[in-house]
Amino acid sequence: VEYILGANDMYDVVKFKTAADKKTVALQPASRPGAVSETVYVLPYSTQKAASGTHGTISKIDTISNNSFYYTLNMKTGEKTVSCPVMNAEGEVVALIQKNSDKESTSSYAIGIGYAKSLSISALSANDYTLNTIGIKKGLPEDESQALVYLYVSSSNLSKEEYLNLLNEFIQQYPKNSEGYSRRALCYMGYGDDAHYALAEKDLQTMVEVNENKGDAYYNLSKLLYNYVLGLQGAKPYGDWTMERALKEINTALENDKQGLYYQLQGDIYFAMQKYPEAFASYDAVNRSPLASAASFYAAAKTKELIE
């Protein structure tokens, strides 16, 4: 098993991805749901000594959700057939046998294959109790925007190493998404040593390369560097990770797009460098943009006081 793709504890179903060679022939899910009175066959595990199949008919079908069904079967099954596939005459999988609470019952129950197929990892699966108790790592959501939210939610629940592994998987699955590189760079920076800073620098460059919005890319790069230098509190920075570098990157962002948000960061950087006339000019540009606010007017006024 490589990773979990979904689970439901009510119906005791888990969907997961496994590694298989090309010679392995997979069973195909049924193209249509089963029908009442249709003859179906239980395919036993190949590890059983007596691998004789069981057959019976469908006596009842309950709809549990859109295109998902729960079957009552006229056949007796035991513990050794739990989760075994229920096949139709075409050799397709209709359902999976469920555990029967009554060992002597001549009826069996099966969850439709459509329900099992519909299981998935969503943006909020990071906090899913059922998935977390399985003990096998979860896959990422197949939708890219959902996968991003999944990253946000997971960042506060995982250890640094676990989160880094998740970021690696995200980048492997979505190599053109710049958010993955910026988040991994930030994670590397959290280790606080030169080896990880070097990895972070590489990711920051890749973040800029893959982001089609260059203004946004250089803004994010500048913001990361600005926050990093502020956090040093006077300590020696790594390489050229300085306010001067942060200023260079935000200036490049402004060359691409003169957004008020970019001027705001430019002003903050100038202010941190104690270049108050330049900071005032930047804040003044913010105040002439749609981003103008009480905070930006206060920043401009405060900076002007320092000039005088």
Regions found by a protein language model. Give the residues of each.
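Residue-level recognition of tetratricopeptide repeat
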Residues: 186-190, 223, 230, 268, ...
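Active-site region of chymotrypsin-like
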Residues: 19-25, 52-121
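Structural motif corresponding to the intra-repeat A-B loop/turn of tetratricopeptide repeats
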Residues: 157, 191-194, 228, 240, ...
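Start-of-helix register in tetratricopeptide repeats
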Residues: 179, 216, 259-261, 293-295
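Conserved active-site neighborhood of the chymotrypsin/trypsin-like protease fold
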Residues: 1-40, 48-51, 67
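Short coil turns that delineate tetratricopeptide repeat
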Residues: 175, 212, 256-258, 291
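C-terminal cap/linker of serine protease catalytic domains
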Residues: 96-162, 166
